[in-house]
Amino acid sequence: MASLEERLTEMLAPSVEDLGYELVGVEYIRAGKHSTLRVYIDQDEGILVDDCAAVSRQVSAIMDVEDPITNEYSLEVSSPGMNRPLFKAEHYQIFAGEEVKIQLRMPIQNRRRWKGVIVSAEDEIICLNIEGREERFSLSNIQKANIVPKFDN
């Protein structure tokens, strides 16, 4: 069965794309009685506040009709930002050579948090170079992944 985030992505992507944006991904963060639905969008020209507002109105209308989340939540629409989240294998392919932090659903070698450079992403397997060793992770076991921002001095 698909996760809530996967179902929301499938439900929202066509409308977001019709507005001219890429739906990068969706995060649903549970926090007691009040949760947050975070929708990340992008386009070649970058994202402005007006873009976020337009997508927010569209997503809000869809959520009101479909009602996939029964408890209270806040809707946030934003660009991926500097510490861009990675959701799909294609994202890892695009950002090959970049440093990434990942958090796993199930630990590997008693660790849930890993940091390394993206080597490849093939057949739903993400390969990272971690301190000179290549480690492989199933995309389905990656709960969260973000690019580590580079700051030039």
Swiss-Prot record:
The UniProt keywords, alphabetically, are: Cytoplasm, Ribosome biogenesis
Q: Can you list the GO cellular component terms from the UniProt entry?
A: cytosol
Q: Which GO terms describe its biological process?
A: ribosomal small subunit assembly; translation
Main subcellular localization, coarse class?
cytoplasm
The subcellular localization recorded is: Cytoplasm
CDD domains in the record: YlxS_C
Q: Which domain of life is it from?
A: Bacteria
Matches recorded under Pfam families: DUF150_C, RimP_N
> What InterPro entries does the record point to?
Ribosome_maturation_RimP, RimP_C, RimP_C_sf, RimP_N, RimP_N_sf
In the record, the note on similarity to other proteins reads: Belongs to the RimP family.
Q: Which PANTHER family match?
A: RIBOSOME MATURATION FACTOR RIMP
Q: Which NCBIfam families match?
A: PRK00092.1-1
Its function, per the record, reads: Required for maturation of 30S ribosomal subunits.
- Name of the protein: Ribosome maturation factor RimP
Q: Which organism is it from?
A: Psychromonas ingrahamii (strain DSM 17664 / CCUG 51855 / 37)
